[in-house]
Amino acid sequence: MSGLTTHILDQASGKPAAGVGVRVSRRDGEQTQWLAELRTDADGRARLVAGEDLAVGGYRLEFAIGDHFKASGLPVSDPPFLDVVVIDFAVSNLDQHWHVPLLVSPYGYSTYRGS
């Protein structure tokens, strides 16, 4: 089953990052097509693109993480060091599921190709 999903984990609290705004777009050369703008669920997860709407090519995820940390009550800089985390990646096989987790704190992040 193909498709594109994400899961955001707040490394500062050790909990899923619920309610984070995520935008997803497909990039084709100079053209950008916005596909979705949504928020993560209570478990920090979001289904971004259904399998039938996924295409081979470049994608961009934009995570509005600054708002999450401002609302968390953690001491963060103003403006936040990380406001929007942008991840550019490519889908190469439509027979696979594409999962892009984000592990994030107010001052750093990492990602990887999940399953």
Curated annotation (Swiss-Prot):
PROSITE patterns listed in its UniProt record: TRANSTHYRETIN_1, TRANSTHYRETIN_2
GO biological process: purine nucleobase metabolic process
EC annotation from Swiss-Prot or TrEMBL: 3.5.2.17
One annotated GO molecular function: hydroxyisourate hydrolase activity
InterPro entries tied to this protein: Hydroxyisourate_hydrolase (IPR014306), Thyroxine_BS (IPR023418), Transthyretin/HIU_hydrolase (IPR000895), Transthyretin/HIU_hydrolase_d (IPR023416), Transthyretin/HIU_hydrolase_sf (IPR036817), Transthyretin_CS (IPR023419)
Record bears the keyword Lipid metabolism: no
Function in brief: Catalyzes the hydrolysis of 5-hydroxyisourate (HIU) to 2-oxo-4-hydroxy-4-carboxy-5-ureidoimidazoline (OHCU).
Miscellaneous comment in the UniProt entry for this protein: HIU hydrolysis also occurs spontaneously, but more slowly.
NCBIfam families according to UniProt: hdxy_isourate (TIGR02962)
Protein name in UniProt: 5-hydroxyisourate hydrolase
